[in-house]
Amino acid sequence: MFKSNPDFMRMAPTPERVLAVCRLVAQKPISETDLRDAMSLLNADVDIQPITESVNVALSELDLIKNQNGLLTLAVDESIISSPTEFRRYVSARVFQKKDTTFYLFTRWVIAQNERLFSLTNWESMAKTCAQEQRELKALNENAVLGWRFWAAFLGLGYLSGTMIIPNMKLRLEDVIKTEFAKKFKCNEAIRATDFIAWLSGKLPEVDMTGKLPLALSAALRTLHELHIIELATWQDGEKIMLYFVDGEPINDFTHITVKEA
């Protein structure tokens, strides 16, 4: 799922399955055979391939578990698997820093499409279009995109709606703000939008922030503003950061941002 490109992203190792694997391993050291038996409830009719692939993602791609003398053990602090939120933040901090993976490259392409995504009405057309336009992703197919969508939604890149993803990075942006913002800036204090974006570009490397911000990030900023988690403001004579224009939206630019203290 998060291997170097080209990687045929699989549908089977979903976030929920990978987390379930980790929580089972956390209970006690266990062999992979016993883990598969436990997760399949010893039902011979259960396809164990999804379990095997989920173990591989947790073991080899996310470093959540490790194999010691034939037994799987947890390789991270148990707090990381204590909730879907903590798990999501751990995964995000890793996968978006690996810029040579198919997952990262395709994510970056998707975010750059903006409103064009709405014309790519199914996963097959999205895969074909990307493969035609991005030489490095020419091997991409529908199954890979079907695997990508579960993790994309879980990590907060957008919302699944039928056969498409609605570009709104609200959850991804909120995670970064809640875990990283206070390390650099003060909450409840307006800072320049240019300073915020310069900082944010390093935290969201999958987003191209040169020029006008893409739709997914613009939607996230507007959503967090409406939820009073942040406040976007335009001050006279301040340098504007342009959001992706949406007709009827009251905020299409800002010069300052205030992050509210939780």
Predicted features and spans:
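Donor-sugar nucleotide-binding helix/loop cap in glycosyltransferases
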Residues: 1-262
